[in-house]
C-alpha cells in the first residue's frame, strides 16, 4: 500500500478485492477449478511479490510489462541470479496451492451445498462492505483512482496500456514516415566539424567526483580543459526505454506520446548535411532506441555482431568504431554513442585488472554486500571516466571545431538508506535514480569560434536542468542545426535558457510534479542537500 494514500483508501484496497475474491470462490462447489480460473491474478500476485522484493513498494507498472519485451536475455539473466529469494517465496506460496487445486479437480472434490449456500448469503454483505469502502475512499480523497490505486484493477489497466503502447510502437514506421525536421545548418560550410553525443547507462551524479563525491571516480575528467559540468540535472524517467528516446528526440515528459510521430536527432543532423553514425554497446530493444539509431548513415549494435548471448564487450570497443568514423575525414560528422556504463552487474563493466576500489566481490543483491557493490559501482564510473577522456583526446587530435555532450539515462539505488532500495526502474523513483551527470566539452577551436556558447554554459552550470528536455536541444545549438523543433530556452549553451518546474514522466505517460509521483521525504531531503529545486 502506498504511504501517500489516506487510511480510507488503504482499507478499500484490502476490503474490496477480498470481497470480490470471496464472491468468486463462493460461486462453485469445486474450489480447485475456481482457483485455476483465477490463475491470471495468481500470476500477478507472484509478479507483485518479486516487485516488492526489488523495490519495496508499488504495483506492477506498465513499464514493467514493457520491460519484459525490451529487456534482452543477458540483462535478464544478470538480474534473475539475484532474485532467488523472491522466487523461492513465490514457489513456496503458490505451487503447493496450485497442486492442491489440481488434486481437487482430478478427484472431483466438492464442498457441501449447505456450505456454499451459506457462503453465497455472506457474499452480499461482504460485497456491500467492499463497495461502501470504495465510496468512502472517493469521498475522502479526490485524487483516488481505482485504475491507479486499486489492485488488481490497476494491474489490468496497465496491461491494457502495455498492449496499446506495444501496438503503437510496432506501427511507428508508418506513423512517423512523413516526419521531417526541416533542418538546416547555420555554421559555415568551409570548416570541418565533429560532434559526439554520449548517452551513458545507470550512472548517478552523486558518485561522480566532478560533483563533489569524496572518492576519485573522475581522475581524468577532473583535469580536462574546456569541460563544463552541470550540477543540478534530473532525468524525467528512470527507465532506459523512455529516458534514452527523450534524450535523442524533441519529446520530453510533457509531450512524450508525440514520440510515435517523430524521428530522432540523427535525422535532424542528416537533414542539416552531416554524415551520421550511431554505435551502441547494448542489444536491440525493439523500440525507439533502435529506431532512432538506425536512422544513421552508419550504425552498429556491437553486442549483436556476435551470435553469443554471453558476449560482453567493454565500452572501449566503441572507440574503435569512432576512430574508423573519424578516419573518413568527412567535413561534417555527427556521432551518437550508447554505452553500457554502470549497468548491473557492476563488476562486469570493467576489466578485473582495473579495479581500483576493493573489495569488489561478492556483489550479490543483498544489503550485507553494500560496500562491495559501491566499490564495484565506483570502479565502473572510473572506467567510464577513462572511456570519455580517451574519446575527448581523439576529438582534440582532429584540431577542428568539435564538441562532446554526455549524460546518463538514469541513476541507481544501491541500498543507500533505511529503505534498502536497489537498482532502478521502480514505479516510484528515488533521488538516486534521477540525479544524473551532465557535461559538455568543447575543443580549443570550437571555443574560439563560438565563445558565446561557452559563456552561456558556464553561466547555466548551477541552474536546474532537465536532461530529458535539454540534451537534444543543447546538441542542436552546439551543432548549429536550425529547425522549428529547436527551442533555445531549453539549451544549456544558450543565454535564453530558462529554468522550469520539475516534472517526471509517470507510468501512464503523464508529466507529474515530483511530489505527485510518490517520492518520499528521504528523496526530497537529498535533493535539498544537493541544492536541487
Which residues does each predicted region cover?
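Membrane-interface soluble catalytic domains
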Residues: 26, 30-33, 121, 267, ...
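Active-site-proximal alpha/beta segments of enzymes that process anionic O-linked groups
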Residues: 129-197, 202-364, 467-468, 473-498
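Histidine-centered active-site microenvironments of extracellular/periplasmic hydrolases
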Residues: 212-216, 400-401, 407-451
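A long, amphipathic alpha-helix that forms part
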Residues: 320-324, 361-404, 440, 462
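Active-site rim elements
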Residues: 146, 253-256, 308-309, 370-385, ...
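Transmembrane and membrane-interface helices of multi-pass
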Residues: 1-151
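Metal-dependent active-site segment of extracytoplasmic phospho-/sulfohydrolases and closely related
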Residues: 196, 380-423, 472-476
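Short beta-strand segments
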Residues: 278-280, 334-341, 378-381, 403-408, ...
Amino acid at each position: 500500500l502506498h504511504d501517500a494514500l489516506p487510511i480510507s483508501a488503504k482499507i478499500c484496497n484490502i476490503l474490496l478485492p477480498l470481497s470480490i475474491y470471496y464472491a468468486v470462490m463462493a460461486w462453485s462447489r469445486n474450489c480447485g477449478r475456481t482457483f485455476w480460473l483465477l490463475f491470471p491474478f495468481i500470476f500477478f500476485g507472484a509478479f507483485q511479490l518479486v516487485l516488492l522484493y526489488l523495490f519495496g513498494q508499488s504495483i506492477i507498472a506498465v513499464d514493467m510489462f514493457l520491460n519484459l519485451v525490451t529487456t534482452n536475455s543477458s540483462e535478464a539473466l544478470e538480474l534473475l541470479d539475484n532474485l532467488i529469494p523472491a522466487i523461492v517465496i513465490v514457489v513456496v506460496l503458490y505451487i503447493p496451492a496450485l497442486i492442491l487445486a489440481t488434486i481437487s479437480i482430478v478427484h472431483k472434490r466438492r464442498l457441501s451445498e449447505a456450505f456454499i449456500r451459506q457462503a453465497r448469503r455472506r457474499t452480499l454483505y461482504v460485497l456491500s462492505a467492499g463497495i461502501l469502502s470504495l465510496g468512502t475512499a472517493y469521498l475522502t480523497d479526490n485524487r483516488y483512482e481505482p485504475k491507479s490505486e486499486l489492485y488488481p484493477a490497476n494491474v489490468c489497466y496497465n496491461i491494457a496500456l502495455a498492449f496499446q503502447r506495444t501496438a503503437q510502437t510496432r506501427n511507428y514506421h508508418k506513423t512517423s514516415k512523413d516526419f521531417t525536421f526541416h533542418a538546416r545548418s547555420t555554421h559555415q560550410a568551409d570548416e570541418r566539424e565533429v560532434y559526439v553525443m554520449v548517452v551513458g547507462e545507470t550512472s548517478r551524479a552523486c558518485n561522480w567526483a566532478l560533483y563533489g563525491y569524496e572518492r576519485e571516480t573522475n581522475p581524468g575528467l577532473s583535469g580536462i580543459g574546456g569541460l563544463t559540468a552541470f550540477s543540478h540535472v534530473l532525468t524525467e524517467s528512470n527507465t532506459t526505454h523512455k529516458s534514452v528516446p527523450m534524450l535523442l528526440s524533441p519529446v520530453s515528459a510533457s509531450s512524450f506520446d508525440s514520440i510515435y510521430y517523430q524521428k530522432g536527432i540523427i535525422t535532424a543532423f542528416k537533414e542539416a548535411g552531416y554524415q551520421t553514425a550511431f554505435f551502441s554497446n547494448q542489444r536491440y530493444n525493439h523500440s525507439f532506441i533502435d529506431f532512432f539509431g538506425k536512422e544513421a548513415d552508419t550504425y552498429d549494435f556491437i553486442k549483436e555482431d556476435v551470435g553469443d548471448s554471453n558476449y560482453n564487450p567493454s565500452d572501449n570497443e566503441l572507440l574503435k568504431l569512432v576512430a574508423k568514423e573519424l578516419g573518413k575525414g568527412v567535413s561534417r560528422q555527427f556521432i551518437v554513442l550508447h554505452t553500457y556504463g554502470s549497468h548491473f552487474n557492476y563488476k562486469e563493466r570493467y576489466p578485473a585488472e582495473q579495479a581500483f576500489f576493493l573489495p569488489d566481490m561478492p556483489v550479490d543483491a543483498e544489503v550485507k554486500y553494500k560496500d562491495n557493490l559501491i566499490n564495484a559501482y565506483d570502479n565502473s564510473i572510473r572506467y567510464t571516466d577513462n572511456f570519455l577522456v580517451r574519446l575527448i583526446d581523439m576529438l582534440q587530435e582532429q584540431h577542428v571545431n568539435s564538441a562532446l555532450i554526455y549524460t546518463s539515462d538514469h541513476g541507481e539505488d544501491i541500498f543507500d538508506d533505511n529503505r534498502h532500495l536497489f537498482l532502478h526502474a521502480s514505479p516510484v523513483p528515488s533521488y538516486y535514480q534521477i540525479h544524473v551527470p551532465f557535461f559538455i566539452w568543447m575543443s580549443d577551436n570550437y571555443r574560439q569560434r563560438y565563445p558565446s556558447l561557452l559563456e552561456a554554459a558556464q553561466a547555466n552550470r548551477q541552474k536546474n536542468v532537465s536532461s530529458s528536455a535539454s540534451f537534444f536541444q543543447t546538441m542542436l545549438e552546439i551543432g548549429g542545426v536550425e529547425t522549428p523543433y529547436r527551442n533555445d530556452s531549453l539549451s544549456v549553451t544558450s543565454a535564453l535558457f530558462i529554468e522550469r518546474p520539475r516534472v517526471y514522466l509517470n507510468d501512464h505517460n503523464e508529466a507529474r510534479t515530483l511530489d505527485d509521483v510518490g517520492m518520499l521525504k528521504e528523496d526530497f531531503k537529498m535533493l535539498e542537500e544537493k541544492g536541487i529545486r
